[in-house]
From Swiss-Prot:
It comes from Arabidopsis thaliana (Mouse-ear cress). Belongs to the eukaryotic ribosomal protein eS17 family. This is Small ribosomal subunit protein eS17x. InterPro entries: Ribosomal_eS17, Ribosomal_eS17_CS, Ribosomal_eS17_sf. Coiled coil: none annotated. One of its GO terms (biological process) is translation. GO terms for molecular function: mRNA binding; structural constituent of ribosome.
């Protein structure tokens, strides 16, 4: 079972990352030295715990936004994503390519005269490759 981190460790790690994000790294020893410089931490053990959790959070931040940490960089990224309007729609309806079966289905529904629909040659599906032992009892 893992160790439980106290509220003090979590809170101080988040504060340090918010203020000194540009200086923090994914390396524990570097983060420990940075903490020594920027914060007054009463004990070596507490400093190491905060540095360890800060390193853990930095690794999580690399993967995506972390709850409880508001970084200006992440906020700008979020705003950019919200305001982004593509030049060209991802859903192009100028030319829709369908197989023979779908075209026949549309014809049966009386919708074969829709503009922009073209037929595409379908490829034969390959039989799936079987890996591992054969099913059933193994014979020698």
């Amino acid at each position: 079972m893992g160790r439980v981190r106290t509220k003090t460790v979590k809170k101080s790690s988040r504060q340090v990352i918010e203020k000194y994000y540009s200086r923090m790294t994914l390396d524990f020893h570097t983060n420990k030295k940075i903490l020594e410089e920027v914060a007054i931490i009463p004990s070596k053990r507490l400093r190491n715990k905060i540095a360890g959790f800060s390193t853990h959070l930095m690794k999580r931040i690399q993967k995506g936004p972390v709850r409880g940490i508001s970084l200006k960089l992440q906020e700008e990224e979020r705003e950019r994503r919200m305001d982004f309007v593509p030049d060209e729609s991802a859903i192009k309806i100028d030319d829709v390519k369908v197989d023979k079966e779908t075209l026949e289905m549309l014809a049966s529904l009386g919708m074969s005269d829709i503009a922009g629909i073209s037929q595409v040659e379908t490829q034969q599906a390959m039989a799936p490759a079987v890996f591992g032992r054969p099913a059933g009892r193994y014979q020698r």
